[in-house]
Design a protein with these regions (language model features):
Chain B
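Short, structured surface patches at the beginning of a domain
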Residues: 1-136
Length: 274, 136
């Protein structure tokens, strides 16, 4: 997306590699930095789903989530989704745990003074269900700032049409440049214009995806045999510009550093006579 | 029996006439409208942020044959261009659906309703002021 970025001597090798990859592809996929935390989250999700459905806690949470279509259909799916979201949002350990999944990568790509989306999103996409589709979009078109990164966390293996797609930077920018010519066409027409270039991201449980939501992305009908479960949350540098998703109503500062705290609270001595 | 089911919400990501409401607030207004009128609410489509862009509205039009109607957060989310607004009305009504503005509690079912909404629109355009140009 940003060509010819010169390496500053202040970068470590690890930071530089991650940053270059992010700029080249618009996303990075890395193994979670905290596998136990991810397992704890998945177990919590499975328990919440079981509680809602009146089922016994499964021995294999991943298989249970993969095969959830045995217990719900599209008409009852949203109630399940809301029950699980409520269970996640009411757990005070959950949001710090979510950050821990890729904390170092986020600090490298976004900064170490972070604002975090207050309500983490949960997607559950049953096989053949056309009611949970997310048409092609870039979050910046929906009121997000271009300074944000999405942390996308699969709770099951995601592949084929069970996963999300993203449009690579070069194709994305070319289409966005001429998108105004499609003003009387639909989002589906837009998808058709980029479909051949869209990359369906293959992620195993334990992988974490960080992507720039300035890139077009979305999902299609899941024609695989199992159900997609994934979580998403946006992070940005506290001091970077905000768009329609404001600090307070949508974002919360989570890692204000000491010097910034002092700066926020400090004011110069006043009331000197001229 | 009709194959149509539900009212699709339609919210925005940009200010309209300089006014902005958070998306969850827009959804609350639409949900409330649907509840008061006994309409099954379908999760809202979110229009893109670019001025003059109505691609998500066009996307909703694709599913019009399956919908009872569209509920806009506000009628002022319609295109500013009169001909484009007319095309929106025609597309919705010719498909057999209806369109409503939740904030204004206005519904468009026929030509008479369109006239009411258009009167409001024209007056709004005529009286549009920019506070940064007001001198006191």
């Amino acid at each position: 997306m940003t060509q010819n970025l010169e390496r500053s001597p202040f970068w470590t090798d690890e930071e530089w590699t991650l940053t270059q990859s992010f700029l080249d592809q618009g996303y990075v996929i890395a193994r979670t930095e905290s596998p136990d935390t991810l397992e704890r989250i998945r177990t919590h999700v499975a328990k919440a789903a079981c509680g809602h459905l009146g089922l016994d806690i499964p021995a294999d949470a991943g298989k249970f989530l993969d095969d959830i279509a045995a217990h719900v259909d599209p008409s009852t799916l949203n109630d399940l989704r809301l029950a699980v979201i409520n269970a996640l949002r009411s757990a005070d350990w959950f949001r710090p745990a979510y950050l821990a999944l890729a904390r170092q990568s986020l600090q490298t790509l976004v900064g170490n003074e972070l604002a975090m989306q207050r309500g983490i999103g949960l997607s559950v996409q049953l096989p053949q269900d056309d009611s949970s589709l997310l048409p092609i979009h870039a979050d910046v078109w929906d009121g997000d700032s271009s300074f944000e990164v999405v942390q996308w966390v699969p709770l099951v293996d995601c592949f084929g049409t069970k996963t999300m797609y993203i449009v690579p930077p070069s194709e994305d920018r070319a289409v966005q440049k001429t998108m105004h010519k499609m003003h009387d066409q639909s989002a589906e027409d837009l998808y058709n214009a980029v479909a051949e270039k869209a990359v369906f991201l293959d992620l195993k449980f334990g992988d974490i995806l960080l992507f720039s939501q300035t890139l077009m992305h979305g999902n299609r009908i899941n024609v695989e045999d199992t159900t997609r479960w994934s979580m998403n949350c946006r992070f940005k540098s506290i001091m970077s510009p905000y768009a329609q998703k404001k600090l307070g109503e949508f974002f919360e500062p989570i890692t204000i550093r000491g010097a910034t705290r002092i700066g926020l609270d400090y004011s110069l001595p006043e009331d000197f006579d001229e | 029996m009709s194959n149509r089911s539900g009212y699709r919400g339609y919210i925005g990501s940009r200010p309209y006439f300089g006014e902005r409401a958070a998306q969850h607030v827009q959804n609350l207004v639409i949900r409330d409208y649907c509840q008061r009128n006994g309409h099954p609410y379908l999760l809202s489509a979110t229009e893109y942020a670019m001025n003059g862009c109505y691609m998500m509205l066009e996307e909703v039009f694709r599913e019009l044959p399956r919908l009872e109607g569209i509920v806009l957060y506000s009628i002022f989310m319609l295109p500013r261009n009169r001909d484009r607004r007319r095309r929106v009305y025609d597309t919705v009504l010719s498909s057999g659906a209806v369109m409503a503005g939740a904030l204004e509690n206005l519904v468009i079912r026929n030509e008479q309703d369109i006239r009411v909404v258009e009167d409001i629109w024209v007056i709004k355009l005529l009286t549009e002021t920019r506070t940064d140009k007001i001198v006191v």
